[in-house]
């Protein structure tokens, strides 16, 4: 088992990664408030890991309530925030309770937001069971739900008490979900770490085979990269925005197609190759660098084309992106592999050209 700290002063918390740690009550104990616990999970994860976590909590003499949501992006809704709050109120849970998010990014995001708003804030623990959640969404305190007009438009920055990532849970992760998580892994190499990107190029076969040593490196390296960035810019006032590489295009794809058609990592993968293309059109990166980025995403088995929809549809969703300022879309682009830049100075014609170049079945 390895641990690292997200250094945020009084809001600092540990990230624990290892095998079999879902059953380690000693890791959970320091992160729990004195009151009861509610485990929020989904219909896919509950049959696999809920009983193990319940036994861990029982060993700590913690009464626990289980809230099982339908699996899928559609569960990230205000209706389910009401559902969670209603269950907690009906059970008499007060401000001394702790919520445990057992699942992937959807469960983590909605549980964190529920914790942020229930009785003006209660403690919560992230217990990620997908690669994407382990390397990205469980770390950093971004919580929220979707709105029909945009992804993650209703939410809060609210840090967990701990992240406890049992890598044994990846054994049951479907291949598509596993590859989706690798999009965020590639992102860290692109924005911050050229050496890590090169390592991924050389070792992607081992990662896709889920070889333990390769997986361990991927998870720990990604968590450290994100923890370092979050520690320097918790509320995304500047630097932290680079973590959104591929997300401006990606969120537009998710919203335009209806949440659920694309996994988040799949949309981000398309968004990253689009961002690389836009960077090349603006002479920020060389064509050879764009080719390397495309090749790695493709080698990972992730999609590289968006569905053919009117360009205006995509642009409409991009304008309501949270990074937009004064109605102007801001992009995270690349100045080479391992270096990102935040800019709102992008010619509209270049955005349209990129969208058209990466749409399936012709251009809209």
Curated annotation (Swiss-Prot):
Pathway assigned in UniProt: Metabolic intermediate biosynthesis; chorismate biosynthesis; chorismate from D-erythrose 4-phosphate and phosphoenolpyruvate: step 2/7
SUPFAM superfamilies reported in the protein's UniProt record: Dehydroquinate synthase-like
* Binding locations of Zn(2+): 184, 247, 264
Q: Which Pfam families match?
A: DHQ_synthase, DHQS_C
Q: Does the keyword Cell membrane apply?
A: no
Q: Does the keyword Cytoplasm apply?
A: yes
- Where is this chain primarily localised? cytoplasm
Q: What are the UniProt keywords, alphabetically?
A: Amino-acid biosynthesis, Aromatic amino acid biosynthesis, Cobalt, Cytoplasm, Lyase, Metal-binding, NAD, Nucleotide-binding, Zinc
| GO cellular component term, pick one | cytoplasm
For this protein, the record's CDD domains field holds:
DHQS (cd08195)
- Function, in words: Catalyzes the conversion of 3-deoxy-D-arabino-heptulosonate 7-phosphate (DAHP) to dehydroquinate (DHQ).
Protein name per Swiss-Prot or TrEMBL: 3-dehydroquinate synthase
Instruction: Name the source organism.
Output: Acidithiobacillus ferrooxidans (strain ATCC 23270 / DSM 14882 / CIP 104768 / NCIMB 8455) (Ferrobacillus ferrooxidans (strain ATCC 23270))
